[in-house]
């Protein structure tokens, strides 16, 4: 463990100007990024008295082996550079505000020809507009069920849409008027996009005009004695009002604001955000984060770090055209103002494209809403602590059990496991999964297409394990020897750290093969074991007999979870490769024919069989297909009649 005194900058060498600094560990990996008004004042605080630092900060300075800094002109520049580096390097000691993917949102795929409304979970994508998040998926489905009476937009998947377009018959929703059936041409693309635009306007808070329009149409139908239409419009109006009731007005001035609240203890903080648009709560998000423990850290620093990371991420994905969809609202309400509130507001204004106000609510509706958000944060932290206490105890017991059973010097905080999957030597793939502190770290998972140990219907599981192991640790050695992280190709350095425990799915042959590769590469301090499936035996290299861990052992249970996760990950990738191979089309081999034009041909003719019967002139009629390409397609599908049919 490095001594902070060994890399402490010389007195007077640190500039007093504002800037951004980076701590690196002994492998050259950036482990912390921070900024300061005065680099000298901030960095000196890390080395003045290490014993008096907060536990997490003390761990930071004793893990680091080097500190670097970059001087900037203003604090706004420092904010931007800090955000960029945190995104690029993903430092382990920085607070990580991961968007909670468990929260469902209502997504509108505006990038498609016929936009779709759907329930969605996952990372944000360009070309898609999001409403929410909602606390439950059923709440979105209930909202969609109400609103598609009035805004009959498409909700089906691409496969369902394509199938009904081919059979020229709408689905059930089309028959009951909950979909405008663009698949069969009941409305064209422009008309459908207008329906979707009205739907988005309604969810954005522009509700009154739709209610007034429906009421006017209902009254007009009644005056014309068209009571059936009037009854249908009455039901539509009722559905619209029920949807409006679900979004009560919380801010009487109809403002757009995000209300942020924190609840924290010595180690962690709960963050809650209510997104208010047009005076109504449109969504809620929550995070639990580890506090960085930086000198003088407090709620003020949490506010600054959260706003920088959250709005930086949201603005990076924003392509909204209208005001209500802007991810940065006019007003951000926080529990306390950070020390650089003016610079932060300026930076947020730059992201938004117009002025953003950063303030603490003092009275009225905004104060009441802020208190509600704070209560939500307190409840979230309390629930997390109860769950964390039981989970942490179980994980600690599992890691301790593995350490004791295998005779390791330390608990295996990072465990990696490899597995191989194939069917009779075809589509041979390997997988590597990573568990840190007993939890899966999915961002570090990797697939491997086996190159040397398999092919042409042959597969050697032992050689495949050796190949995956060699590629994994060669990557580790390469990352370790090149600490320059600033070049774009060095951004992903997930394997700069070696695992404490390397697990292979198999018995003595597999574990001996992996161990031989690791020894050959000169990698030390990595324990290697194999976990055999049938009797759950733990094999150690060069040992004639396995280790038998107790069946009720928490350690064995964790190893089984790791092994099963590697198996699941390998099977998933294998099935994907096999499916791709089995569904390969005869069009794939046509030179100059890309995926877009292949889809256009199949869509136009309905199937490969019909395309085979087409002449060159008929193929040329497809938009984007020229004579040369049509001839190549014709000859590829009907090689026996090349040049005959025109």
UniProtKB/Swiss-Prot annotation:
Keywords tagged on the record: Cytoplasm, DNA damage, DNA excision, DNA repair, Excision nuclease, SOS response
Record-linked NCBIfam families: PRK00558.1-5, uvrC
Family as reported in the entry's similarity comment: Belongs to the UvrC family.
Gene Ontology biological process terms from the UniProt entry: DNA damage response; nucleotide-excision repair; SOS response
SMART domains with a match to the protein in the record: GIYc, HhH1
An MF annotation (GO) of this entry: excinuclease ABC activity
Function in brief: The UvrABC repair system catalyzes the recognition and processing of DNA lesions. UvrC both incises the 5' and 3' sides of the lesion. The N-terminal half is responsible for the 3' incision and the C-terminal half is responsible for the 5' incision.
Name of this protein: UvrABC system protein C
InterPro entries: GIY-YIG_endonuc (IPR000305), GIY-YIG_endonuc_sf (IPR035901), GIY-YIG_UvrC_Cho (IPR047296), Hlx-hairpin-Hlx_DNA-bd_motif (IPR003583), RuvA_2-like (IPR010994), UVR_dom (IPR001943), UVR_dom_sf (IPR036876), UvrABC_protein_C (IPR050066)
Organism classification: Bacteria, Bacillati, Actinomycetota, Actinomycetes, Mycobacteriales
SUPFAM superfamilies (UniProt xref): C-terminal UvrC-binding domain of UvrB, GIY-YIG endonuclease, RuvA domain 2-like
Quaternary data: Interacts with UvrB in an incision complex.
Locations listed in the record: Cytoplasm
Residue span, UVR domain: 208-243
Native source species: Mycobacterium tuberculosis (strain ATCC 25618 / H37Rv)
